[in-house]
Amino acid sequence: MQDEWQIAPRLSINGGVRLEWATEPEEKYGRDVALPNLTDRAPTIGRLYENPGVNVSPRGGFAWNVTGDGRTSLRGGYGLYYNTNNQQNLIVTITNPPFTPRPVIASPTFPNPPFNRAGATSIRPMQFDLEYPRVHVWNLSAQRELPWQTVATVSYAGSRGRHLLRSNDVNTALPTSLADGTPFFPAGTPRQNTAFSTIELKSSD
């Protein structure tokens, strides 16, 4: 929904709002796997994440004939835009246990087969309270008509992304500190959640 108003002979504004709804993906046979809390000892079979619901995208702008002669103008605008969840983040969840175990090899020494398994599997969950990525976009520009059919323009455009998607292992071991404050990982330091090896979380912070 969007409209424009001529609120004065030299000033017009426009504004609008867009409502967006993205449905939750579902595996045909109900084999979606989640890890609602990173401290859980086993994955949960069910929804991948909580749907954030309706996204509201406002936008607006203005155009001002500064001098009234049509030779100098000032324009500006702002908009908020959402993205959907990255499909790649959804696809990799099919490799999650218990339906598709992903064992991690602890000591792959070839002269000593079989490999020594670590005793824990890795998992690639979605952040359960996921927020959809969004970007705030704004701009401001001034134009002045010059002789010789020339127009001078000075513009500023900016944007800021929030809740951008990322992927990283959130189940790393916690370091200790040496006497000088240097972080140190002693050999054999366990991961934070010992039920899993890597927890490759697909998150939006």
Show where each model-derived region lies.
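Solvent-exposed loop/turn elements at secondary-structure boundaries
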Residues: 28-57, 61-202
